[in-house]
A protein has these predicted regions:
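Short aromatic-glycine-(Arg/Gly/Cys) micro-motifs in beta-strand/loop hairpins
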Residues: 326-342
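SH3-family beta-barrel domains
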Residues: 314-330
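Non-globular, low-confidence helical/coil segments that flank catalytic cores
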Residues: 2, 17-319, 339, 345, ...
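Compact, charge-rich alpha-helical regulatory domains located at protein termini
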Residues: 337-368
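Bacterial N-terminal signal peptides
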Residues: 8-16
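Residue-level signal for mature regions of secreted extracellular proteins and peptides
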Residues: 13, 330, 356-359
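Hydrophilic extracytoplasmic domains
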Residues: 288, 320, 353-357
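Positively charged n-region of N-terminal signal peptides that target proteins for export
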Residues: 1-9
Length: 368
């Protein structure tokens, strides 16, 4: 897949983005806002996204998640934010020209994911409605079920490996691969493929389920990753990120939220892996558009790289490369190494010298 630098769309209102400010960010740069850059590693001229047959909208629903996916005029929705976000999500879908939804997915039964889906089901006819569970003891989940049934539909729990068409894109259920008592780990994990581009939606999946998913042998490699659990340190392990190898990570979280999301530990891991980070708390609604070969990004607001990555080595002279040690072999690796140990056998070093001082030797494959 040909990777494009993030592209700002001056015509964001034509895409139906909420608000009037649009921007583009060049992650890893000097921290300055770069208006409307359009660069490609291979020299391919990117489109502005308006004519793209595929779009993925990470709707700004604050400390919650809602993702609208469109391909060839067909739509699916992954989560609906909180109950109070229902009218916002409905309005956004209407602005995008949604008249019906092929699929509605509730990643898991927490209110910040299922809450707004009742309002969506009350407004838009759907082909199918899916969830990781059939029952939950919350009013918001039961309201989702009620409005689903009022359409004459039954809520379905899909099986891993199920593949759905969405226009010329395909949507595949990768997880959860086993049963969990922790609700976050029951999140439906979806892989979306469109042409040579790929996208991964993970809900609030945490590290235990990430490890199980990696061990399942599922094809996790994706260009764009919805970073799990709003950027919490309970998600996004080195092992999982090494399997996905995303170019872009999108975090849906609220401004100054009480949980401190995204956590610095997660941002550090993403930096170490060279992932470009986009956050709804700083950028508002984020729209990824693709023609099947390239993808572009539009954001509702401006933000500098220094804001997106407050301790990014590119803007902090004191930051150092992190290394991962193997407590059994006493070797240490770059986070991108293909030979990383299991997470339980990992130890993190903040510098090369620290690892050597601890008695570890560098991996000959990744550290030259």
């Amino acid at each position: 897949m040909i990777r494009l630098a993030a592209l700002a769309l001056a015509a964001a209102l034509a895409l139906g983005l909420v608000g009037c400010d649009t921007s583009s960010i060049v992650p890893g740069g000097s921290g300055d806002v770069m208006p409307n850059p359009a660069a490609s590693q291979t020299g391919t001229t990117p489109s502005d996204g308006q004519d793209a047959a595929f779009q993925m909208h990470f709707i700004d629903v604050g400390q919650a998640l809602s993702v609208l996916v469109e391909c060839d005029g067909q739509f699916m929705l992954y989560d609906g934010g909180n109950v109070d976000d229902g009218s916002l999500v409905v309005s956004y879908l209407q602005k995008q020209g949604v008249e019906q939804l092929q699929y509605v997915f509730c990643s898991h039964a927490h209110e910040d994911h299922v809450g707004g889906l009742a309002a969506v089901m009350a407004k838009f006819p759907a082909g199918h409605a899916y969830s990781s569970v059939m029952e939950a003891s919350t009013k918001c989940f039961n309201d989702f079920v009620k409005y689903t049934q009022q359409q004459g539909l039954q809520l379905e729990v899909p099986s891993v490996g199920t593949v759905w068409p969405l226009g010329s894109a395909t949507v595949t259920l990768l997880g959860p691969v086993t049963q969990y008592s922790e609700t976050n780990n029951t999140s439906l994990v979806l892989r979306i493929d469109y042409g040579n581009t790929s996208y991964l939606l993970t809900g609030d999946m945490e590290k235990t389920a990430e490890t199980d998913l990696v061990n399942s042998g599922a094809n996790l490699k994706a260009d764009v990753l919805q970073v799990g659990h709003h950027g919490s340190s309970t998600s996004t392990s080195y092992v999982f990120l090494n399997a996905v190898l995303p170019e872009m990570g999108i975090i849906s979280c609220g401004v100054n939220n009480k949980y401190g999301h995204p956590h610095e530990e997660t941002l550090s891991i993403l930096r170490d892996a060279g992932v470009d980070v986009y956050r709804t708390d700083l950028l508002g609604t984020i729209t990824v558009s693709s023609d099947g070969q390239n993808y572009t990004v539009a954001t509702e607001h401006f933000a500098t790289d220094a804001e997106l990555n407050p301790t990014d080595p590119a803007v902090s002279s004191t930051a150092q490369q992190a290394y991962i040690g193997n407590v059994n072999s006493k070797k240490f690796h770059l986070p991108s190494c293909a030979n990383l140990p299991a997470e339980k056998n990992q130890i993190l070093f903040s510098s090369y010298d620290e690892a050597v001082a601890a008695g570890y030797s560098p991996c000959s494959s990744c550290i030259k």
